[in-house]
Amino acid sequence: MACCSTSFCGFPICSTAGTCGSSCCRSTCSQTSCCQPTSIQTSCCQPTCLQTSGCETGCGIGGSTGYGQVGSSGAVSSRTRWCRPDCRVEGTSLPPCCVVSCTSPSCCQLYYAQASCCRPSYCGQSCCRPACCCQPTCTEPVCEPTCSQPIC
């Protein structure tokens, strides 16, 4: 059974290891995953997280959801769910599961994502850049189509 752990601004993300807290609870034990906000309930906690795939079900670029609350920035009142690639090549162990974003999409984020250019970020998402997008951070509004530097 999978469970969710709360991380990055307090939003639930799918976890493949560790122990469960209240964010992993569900109303019945018949559900196989709580990766989606709609399946997170208040009872029947699972003690461990064993699921390694399937967390991306129902994800997509865009699409607003009312789950969660406004982050510390207070800039947005809704959240966008998406599937992010596995960014472990850049040193983070976060799984490629559904997450709830804390920022609006940008070209340096998931739409043009390539796993080899991922950078870890906050709020459970990853900043992912095209192969030769040489912006130093994902807060830049424009991505470079080609590299002027030998290493991106």
From Swiss-Prot:
Name of this chain's protein: Keratin, high-sulfur matrix protein, B2C
Each sequence repeat occupies one of these ranges, namely: 27-36, 37-46, 47-56
UniProtKB keywords: Acetylation, Keratin, Repeat
Q: Which organism is it from?
A: Ovis aries
Q: Please explain the role this protein plays, according to its UniProt record.
A: The keratin products of mammalian epidermal derivatives such as wool and hair consist of microfibrils embedded in a rigid matrix of other proteins. The matrix proteins include the high-sulfur and high-tyrosine keratins, having molecular weights of 6-20 kDa, whereas the microfibrils contain the larger, low-sulfur keratins (40-56 kDa).
Please give the superkingdom of this protein's source: Eukaryota
In this UniProt entry, the residues modified to N-acetylalanine are A2
Q: Which GO terms describe its cellular component?
A: cytosol; keratin filament
Span of the signal peptide: none
Q: Is Repeat given among the entry's keywords?
A: yes
Q: Does the keyword Protein transport apply?
A: no
Q: What else is known?
A: The source of this keratin is lincoln wool.
